[in-house]
A protein has these predicted regions:
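Catalytic alpha/beta core domains of metabolic enzymes, predominantly
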Residues: 1-61, 71-72, 76, 91
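Short beta-alpha connecting loops at secondary-structure transitions
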Residues: 65-67
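Mid-to-C-terminal alpha-helical segments outside catalytic/metal-binding sites
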Residues: 83-112
Length: 112
């Protein structure tokens, strides 16, 4: 689910708590879902998705700011999301766990 792109894409959905809750409510039981939100919607949408058992995508592709007027780095955006996950007594997926969830092959180990 991508939310918050309504200013740039015709037919896109804005982010609101109610919209995300409704979209998740329409999924089949036991669905695995991921939420990505654009711009200022990124922090509230990803936090809500985590609380509702979803997966998230964060980074500069979707949001250039850490807070109002403060440019972000990918590292800052990822670190904040990891902090939120851990504050909720959850554990973020490792790169290999994420690959497994997505059905991706693990990179070849380098010799040496």
């Amino acid at each position: 689910m991508v939310l918050g792109a309504d200013k740039g894409f015709q037919g896109a959905m804005p982010y609101s708590h109610d919209i995300l809750t409704a979209m998740i409510g329409m999924l089949p039981p036991q669905s695995i879902f991921c939420v990505s939100a654009i711009g200022p919607a990124q922090l509230p949408a990803t936090t809500q998705a985590i609380l509702l058992g979803g997966h998230v995508r964060v980074g500069l592709e979707d949001n250039n700011y850490y807070s109002k007027g403060q440019l972000a780095t990918n590292e800052q955006l990822v670190a904040r999301t990891v902090r939120i996950i851990k504050e909720l007594n959850l554990e973020p997926a490792s790169p290999n766990e994420a690959r497994d969830m997505l059905g991706l092959k693990h990179p070849a180990r380098m010799a040496g």
